[in-house]
Amino acid sequence: MQIKSAKFYLSSQKEKDCPKTIMPEYAFIGRSNVGKSSLINMITNQNKLAKTSSTPGKTQLINHFLINNSWHIVDLPGYGYAKTSKSNKKHFQKSITDYFKHRKQLASAFILIDLRHSPLKIDLDFILWLATNKIPFSIIFTKIDKLTKTEIDNKLLNYKKELEKNWEILPEIFLSSSKKHRGKEDILNYIDKINQSII
């Protein structure tokens, strides 16, 4: 799939304030500083569509981007940022859970995980929560340019072993590097395949 147009559409604090459209949506979420905004910019051929920052927890709203005038990318607040206040954590958690539980336009979620790290409970718990609530999702492992091929293979194997504790069939998995533009085609082809079945 080719991205012919990509533009900011709307920022919302709550799920009920999100766009009232019937277009399919693909939500991108992960721990703070996982490279989410950089990935969105990479797959949309934009440099500044999603605001990037070295400060974790920068994304604090539900941000919709209109792609090819037919579907949305949704940039969700990152989870697990320790320096966020308790009240903000509670607000972010509610806005995220409300979005996933009630947003009928959601076609699939993409969970972003920094492959440099060992499997973390916060990521595994969130993945399990999505599965328990029957929310379709895939996993994108980010920042693979920081690893050797052997390190990628070993770390990917560790994650698969953890996931296999709860699943016989693993979710779709993508490897990406925004810096090296890796994974873009696979992710867009996957989205296109889903779009073809519902648009």
PLM feature spans:
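Structured catalytic cores of enzymes that bind and process phosphorylated ligands/cofactors
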Residues: 33-34, 40, 55, 63, ...
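Conserved nucleotide-sensing/catalytic segment adjacent to the nucleotide-binding pocket
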Residues: 68-106
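Conserved nucleotide-binding/hydrolysis micro-motifs of P-loop NTPases
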Residues: 58, 71, 78-81, 116-118, ...
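Conserved C-terminal guanine-recognition region of P-loop GTPase G domains, centered on the G4
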Residues: 97-170
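Canonical P-loop GTPase G-domain recognition
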Residues: 3-15, 146-199
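Helical mechanochemical/support elements of P-loop NTPase systems and associated helical scaffolds
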Residues: 48, 61, 72, 88, ...
